[in-house]
Swiss-Prot record:
CDD domains: AlaRS_core. SUPFAM superfamilies: Class II aaRS and biotin synthetases, Putative anticodon-binding domain of alanyl-tRNA synthetase (AlaRS), ThrRS/AlaRS common domain, Translation proteins. Gene3D superfamilies: 2.40.30.130, Bira Bifunctional Protein, Domain 2, Threonyl-trna Synthetase, Chain A, domain 2. The keyword Membrane does not apply. It is an enzyme of class 6 (ligase). Its EC number is 6.1.1.7. It catalyses: tRNA(Ala) + L-alanine + ATP = L-alanyl-tRNA(Ala) + AMP + diphosphate. This is Alanine--tRNA ligase.
Amino acid sequence: MEKQTGELDLKFFKNNGFEKKICRVCGSYFWTTDSRRETCGDTPCDEYTFIGNPPVPKKYTLSEMRKAFFDFFEKRGHKLLEPYPVVPRWREDVLLVNASIYDFQPHVTSGIVKPPGNPIVMSQPSIRMNDVDLVGVTGRHLTSFEMLCHDAFNSKNDFVYWKEETVRYSYEFLTDGLGIDGSLITYKEKPWSGGGNAGNALEVFVRGLEVATLVFMDMKEDQEGEVEIEGTRYTKMDMQIVDTGYGLERLTWLSQGTPTVYQAIYPEIIDYVLENSYVESIDNEFLSDVVRVSVMREPYDEAFVLSTLGEKYPNALERFEKAKKVRDIFVLIDHARSLMHMFEAFVIPSNVKVGYLARLLIRRSIRAQKNIGFKGSLINLIERNYNELKDIVKPLPIEFIKDVLSIEMQKYSELEKRGQQVIEKILKTKKSIDIDDLVLLYDSHGISPDVVAAMAAEKGLKVMIPPNFHAMVISRHEKKSALKKSAKVYPNIETRTLYYDDSTMREFTGLVMYSKGNEVILDKTAFYPEGGGQPADHGYFEFKGKKINVLDVQKHGNAIVHKLDGEIPEGVRVKGVIDWERRSRLMVHHTATHLLLGVLRDILGDHVWQSGVQKDVSESHLDITHYKRIDEDTIKKIEHRIFELITEGRPVSVKNLDWYMAIGKYGFRLFEGGVPLSPKVRVVEIEGVDAEGCGGTHLKNISSIGVLKIKKIEAIQENIYRITFVAGVPALELFEDSYDLAYRVSNISKKNIDQAGDFVENTVRELSKIKRDLDSARTKLIEEEIRKSNSIKLGEKEIPAIEAETSDIDIVSRIAHSKGIEVIIESRVGTKFRYTAISPSGKSKQILHDLLHTDAEGNDKLSYVIVDHKELSITR
């Protein structure tokens, strides 16, 4: 986008005494009513002059500022919306909500779904982790903040307002609403992009502080687009969207003029932490100057800050070091608020995706607690944050949070202990510790870079910690998205979906609209295409007296493509026949998946979310988020509850609801199985158990499932459990197989079936004892053989050599390591000979090389060579 397009030369500016100028520092265009102003108002072009000199007559709290914003825009016809969760379950391309517009991308911004109001006003809690290292450092950075917005979604048939009204509203809110002198406000022109959209924008500044951004979104991402912004191409879209973002915390800070933003938004919590830590007080005079100076250099430059402050304060370094303790107070409180929002959305800490971000915040919080000697608890800080925000935050799952934090703190403590050993090991083998070492120690062992630096300093080594270390680590875990191109292009034919009209339809007649090779598209079909974890239907088409098998079915746009084992020409009518046994089993397993998920959530807790799923004919699996092992008693409880519901015979209903009507009734749980980009959501509901947006085929009543049996539960990654189960006929087959096995054991053991399990347990126990006894006897025998064996002389040392079976090598290895001796073993392997060397000191490969003059396989403590002929003369 060109720097100057003239698209922001608005009548409002001209009619209200604004002049368009070019900033003498950065060269950007900006608008102001102050004829003497030469700079755009942004830092570092301008300083922070509001600290100690707030331009707002009244000092607002967060809740007061939020209410003032809502009142102003509700009076002007804006519908007030409730905030969305910070974890965007309605989209799959981002981990956290970074801005209010995320709530409406891509379904509303693309024009597919009507907005929930037009225009709207809201305050959206948001979390941004890219500046996590600067929290507490600059006095202005936050991971958690609320973005106030007034948005309008303009289409051809529904135009609300655009640039003129948007700027007027912002100006009137700041001047009439908050009482700010209009001459202090500047509007800086700057293009904006994010979430697949872009447009012209105005950044709004007051006394150096950016308080809002007004985006006029009218472009969408397009690889062939004519406009380029920051390396990405865009093209015009049909919608014109007003996307504004006002920083609630920044407006509150502006009204109070405190040294830092934290003191404006967390005053009572800061006092509480001060009372319960060894930080005595906050040096407000010095801190004010730290903040003022820090904004004058991007990125943050500590050396510049110290140098500048040194000109004013003779003891700048001493005061700066004391101020670092105050940083930890701000970090602790900020992170507690972000964690509160994450836990409200039932995020479980882990090593992947949003769970990783939660874990990072927890570990930084633990570190901050230790640095200031905080006597309170993180859960207490989370609750205090909630008490200040309970008007906009749903009740917290306190027991869940306590459980999760307890587990995380235990893990961190264990990792720290192991990590110390890892650091010492690295320091023994390396002369320096690089960034990759720091990332490994942090990611895998939870060791903060400053701990590594302290340990390295004791060894006389200096560790360079990147100032953006945590942001750099986070970038390795962020979800990446890219425009996907279909590998194959099909004609835009809309296939009518008969499987939705009647999921029990087994036969149909359709017209072949497209045929190429072994692929056909019909005008209508009862064959279900693969999707939502449900495999495609199989069956056949009847054509000219022949059966042509349907091997696969896929959906491409509105067309449903059938892959065949033969060819059918275009323009003919064919009869389609569904493989009903396969379809019915898939319907049972698909419906059973919904039932299982609902019961798991009911018994394990609301933190259970679907993480993955695969339905199949013989068995299915469901992956869920959960942070504790699921024991046998809980499995039985789950199965019994499912059986009760099946016996009750709960009906299964399917409804196509408008997007926001569906969300209003069922919440964002709807999107556990995926997010449809369509104006309506197909909601599959098991009465009183589960409701989910789903495109699959289902039973009319869960009684048709018959029975469900969990086969196994396994942790497939941290805090993700896979539940493999069978339902219907496959469950019956499992019971039959299990009974047959028990019957066979009963016959072999001459015991009743109800005693067969005890018999097997006792037999296994006895066999294990016999094996241990044999192993002990064999160990003693081999020890005696080693003692009596001939030795082979290699250089200055003699090494015992014995003949042994390959199955005895593990025993020999245990003996060698326990006694600290080296041993050579000769074993017969078919017609060949294997020579194994065992060396606790790590010289096994060298021993074999000296002995046989060839390279060995294995490791330095146990290696071997296989040769064609007997090479040694070993006598027992």
